């Protein structure tokens, strides 16, 4: 490891921190299982919603998930390779023509439905 310098050193450190995650893209509906520490106990919370965007690469890659709860839109951004993500599960695959789905924010819940990939 001491022989590596510069960009090679950065890439080798990044490779050790990458997690094995399933393939998903904007338009897919995913479940994100998040580890939460509450004082002396630990639990897993599930956040299910539509992937609006995915950006970055390697260790710094993030994705944003949107869901509607009690009539209010909630968006959370997660690092893909975070240790707090227990797992990411793809519920269904959607067909979209954009990489960033910010237009979904302005649509009603019925109009914001995404076609499902067969």
UniProtKB/Swiss-Prot annotation:
A single GO BP: translation
Superkingdom per UniProt: Bacteria
InterPro entries with a match to the protein in the record: Ribosomal_bL19, Ribosomal_bL19_sf, Translation_prot_SH3-like_sf
This protein's UniProt keywords: Ribonucleoprotein, Ribosomal protein
Any one GO MF annotation of this record: structural constituent of ribosome
Gene3D superfamilies: 2.30.30.790
SUPFAM superfamilies: Translation proteins SH3-like domain (SSF50104)
Gene Ontology CC, one term: cytosolic large ribosomal subunit
Spans through the membrane: none
Keyword Metal-binding: no
NCBIfam families: rplS_bact
Family: Belongs to the bacterial ribosomal protein bL19 family.
Function: This protein is located at the 30S-50S ribosomal subunit interface and may play a role in the structure and function of the aminoacyl-tRNA binding site.
Protein name (Swiss-Prot/TrEMBL): Large ribosomal subunit protein bL19
Gene: rplS
């Amino acid at each position: 490891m001491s022989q590596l310098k510069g960009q090679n050193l950065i890439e080798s450190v990044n490779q050790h921190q990458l997690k094995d995650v399933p393939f998903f893209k904007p338009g897919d509906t995913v479940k994100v299982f998040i580890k939460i520490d509450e004082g002396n106990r630990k639990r897993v919370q599930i956040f299910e919603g539509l992937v609006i965007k995915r950006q970055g690469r390697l260790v710094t890659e993030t994705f944003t998930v949107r869901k509607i709860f009690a009539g209010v839109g909630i968006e959370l951004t997660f690092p893909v390779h975070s240790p707090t993500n227990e797992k990411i599960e793809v519920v269904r695959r959607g067909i979209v023509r954009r990489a960033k789905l910010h237009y979904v924010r302005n649509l009603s819940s019925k109009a914001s439905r995404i076609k499902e990939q067969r």
